[in-house]
């Protein structure tokens, strides 16, 4: 209830304003943002690898299908939340709008606690995040100290961390880290894409707030515009399932990689931001009218907010194409022991994109003295900011397209790339196979021992 200390939260039934100093309001506000970010970041990074444990032996087609429907369910829940809670906050009571997520969070914690035995069943893996950073640090340190003597027989700079090259980590740990670092270019190109997605709660939000929200006597909630970006994802997932079966994974040799989805999704995001720029120019051509929002009278454009729907739709199409494909590549292109770490890095770079979006907004506001990102949209040139971001996104798309071929080999077994020299692991797997074969012979009377 006190997460976001707006004034109407502190009005009781007698309409008496509860005095809370601005300093305390800021403390509560930033503390709430910190706890929310920690919770959301942890859930988004951990839940998906836990759910995908049952699919570790499946191929890329089944994995992409899983991630498609996983994010489909997530966005279906988001659509319900945006429609219901946003209406309650804007038209009924903002206090109740904050209380509902609080109660839902408590129920989710109780449910996870009750089901923890079913969710956490994987033994501790050999590789951890500290091991990954340790391999990178050891390689850099060894390379700097003994560069003259070790550079001749090393094909990759991370090989300096191997024990036979003067490092302190085994070959399996180093090779796992190498497979993870190959994904860093993929993660890096998602930063600017995530910056475009973050325009929904920033630039797109301001556009909607400064447009006509009245529709047949009903005030349309601003947050409900997010549903327009979710609807394309809910529609496209079943269509993409058919495309995946018929074209994308038709065969190991002639099929295409999901990187084509990422390229098309990045193009859709760039078009979305470009359309937002043209929509801003179009919005200014309408006369201004007064509109009451949260008990404040604002001068807004008389353009209906639904004219902004195309930019939301394009961004929804981008999310439907990019997010599941990136999750598939992050999960499939690394060995089993570090798949959770790979998903965590994907979430980390997505978070970096959110910070990049905030940085762009602050820089545009300060660098242009409020002209590119103004407080009052009719007095500034917000469209220039959108066109600048769209041009950056186009360059980002071309950059990813040039390296997309690196992530096409989804049918390779990345756990066997470096298994040839690991005799211990081979013997362990051979022992398991012998035990399984012996158990089959003992339990099946139709088999007779070979002489």
Regions found by a protein language model. Name each.
Residues 1-451:
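Hydrophobic transmembrane alpha-helices of multi-pass solute transporters/permeases
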